[in-house]
């Protein structure tokens, strides 16, 4: 059985499949990306074989920032009697993500990417597939009864899959975060992010020392470097001026094969960011005469 992913996936959507390849002998294959580092329907079609059982992709990648055509990809894998699994960590907080419209079989996303607490996440699955899932751990709360004769009766979904004491405080915090985002409106959040992204790219492109690795990003994610400067040093420099960016490989260690660089600085725009903050970033990047004084 084959599982299709890409080299732009987060570790959370790579390592579990690689472990299953070792344990039970599945075959992990990579869908090639095009010259813009994006997934195309043509490349998906060419990657599917009679042995393909799963396509597992991020809806929005956390480095390239592209929005995948999940609805069309889902149609292709279902025609092959396979499953569509989606990493929604970068889509659910930022844009409308419709599991029914896109015919997604499983969708996973986390609270801390959408103003919620850490240690909490969501797994959506079609009920017919959840019914067949084996719990990954066992304990109190998941069973209706168990007897000395070793008979066990488990509860119905979702309790059957949730043993022990849940992260109650985390779940309640996540609920409030969702309510807050819904009050603002996911469409309004997405519109705001795209406006900021376009504004940011226009400004960054005017700085000759800046190299942008995803100029065609379709989300609020922009990755860049100051030429000939380590990403971590750029991050330290910006931090001196109270500007926070992420520096490193962003848990996508294979994407270097696509963009040609191991570490980058990543800007992840969200509902709380402003054009004034972008202006401050641009000002610091343009007037970087003190860069070496700060990082050395």
What is each model feature region?
Residues 1-296:
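Pyridoxal 5′-phosphate
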